[in-house]
Amino acid sequence: MYAVLTTGGKQYRVQEGDVLFVEKLNAEVDSTVELTEVLAVAKDGEIKVGAPVVEGAKVVAKVLAQGKAKKVVVFKYKRKKDYRRKNGHRQPYTKIVIEKIEA
């Protein structure tokens, strides 16, 4: 059994037990979150596709950690003009494990 869900503007194909790094969710570590935007569910060879979401379907996940990704360095410059700007960005993420798919 698997499900296709959307969170943080991205889509993920998940099964029970999968560990994901998703865009930051407002949840405490070791708490559970319900992801209700389930686009498709496959069970016993039968695929149910929502329009746009599957009615009554949800994915229950447990938050393992909150953190920041590796730093991305943004360096802008204009040649011959002594213009240089160095900037860094670390995207926050949430590490979750899929506990249950309900459909």
From Swiss-Prot:
GO terms for molecular function: rRNA binding; structural constituent of ribosome. InterPro entries: bL21-like, bL21-like_sf, Ribosomal_bL21, Ribosomal_bL21_CS. HAMAP family: Ribosomal_bL21. This is Large ribosomal subunit protein bL21. Belongs to the bacterial ribosomal protein bL21 family. This protein binds to 23S rRNA in the presence of protein L20. One of its GO terms (biological process) is translation. Part of the 50S ribosomal subunit. Contacts protein L20. GO terms for cellular component: cytoplasm; ribonucleoprotein complex; ribosome. It holds the Pfam family Ribosomal_L21p. The keyword Chloroplast does not apply. It comes from the Bacteria. It comes from Clostridium perfringens (strain 13 / Type A). Keywords: Ribonucleoprotein, Ribosomal protein, RNA-binding, rRNA-binding.
